[in-house]
């Protein structure tokens, strides 16, 4: 595919809910206008499944395209020594590497949780992740900014959105 026809790709991973929990898939009890907007203006997956509906193995499967029995992340990586030392998918090819090889500019902003989070992973031009694991939604936050420990104060959603928007604005024109 030529560069002129190559689509932009922006992925939002959300945690801890089933498809049935979102209004865009028919739930009328939940109000989520931003997710509804994204679903109506982008690609909406209507036949997608996870091999393991738990945070860490689901993320590892998304990034590698492999099953937990293949990539080795079988359960949630606890916010403890395990999250700091578990190699997770560090030694495996991830989707960001493949996209980089195809000429894309890649970034991760937010929760990695498929291996150690403090150091940037192969394939990502930009890396802004939780230092270890997700923190309270408001207050002092610890992040890994390109591998450097930084602390920020505020709402997680605002801090992460600002980082993502900066990455999108600062990337080279293509």
Regions from the language model: what does each represent?
Residues 1-174:
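Formylglycine-dependent sulfatase
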């Amino acid at each position: 595919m030529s560069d002129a026809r190559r689509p932009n790709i922006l992925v939002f991973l959300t945690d801890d809910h089933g498809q049935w929990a979102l209004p865009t898939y028919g739930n009328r009890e939940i109000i989520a206008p931003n997710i509804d907007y994204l679903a109506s203006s982008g690609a909406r997956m209507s036949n997608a499944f996870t091999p393991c509906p738990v945070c860490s193995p689901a993320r590892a499967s998304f990034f590698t395209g492999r099953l937990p029995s293949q990539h080795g992340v079988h359960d949630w990586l606890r916010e403890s020594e395990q999250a700091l030392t578990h190699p997770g998918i560090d030694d495996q090819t991830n989707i960001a590497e493949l996209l980089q090889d195809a000429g894309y500019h890649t970034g991760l902003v937010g929760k990695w949780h498929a291996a150690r989070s403090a150091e940037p992973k192969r394939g990502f031009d930009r890396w802004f992740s939780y230092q270890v694991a997700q923190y309270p939604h408001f207050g002092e936050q610890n992040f890994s900014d390109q591998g450097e420990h930084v602390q920020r104060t505020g709402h997680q959603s605002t801090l992460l959105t600002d980082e993502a928007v900066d990455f999108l604005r600062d990337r080279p024109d293509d």
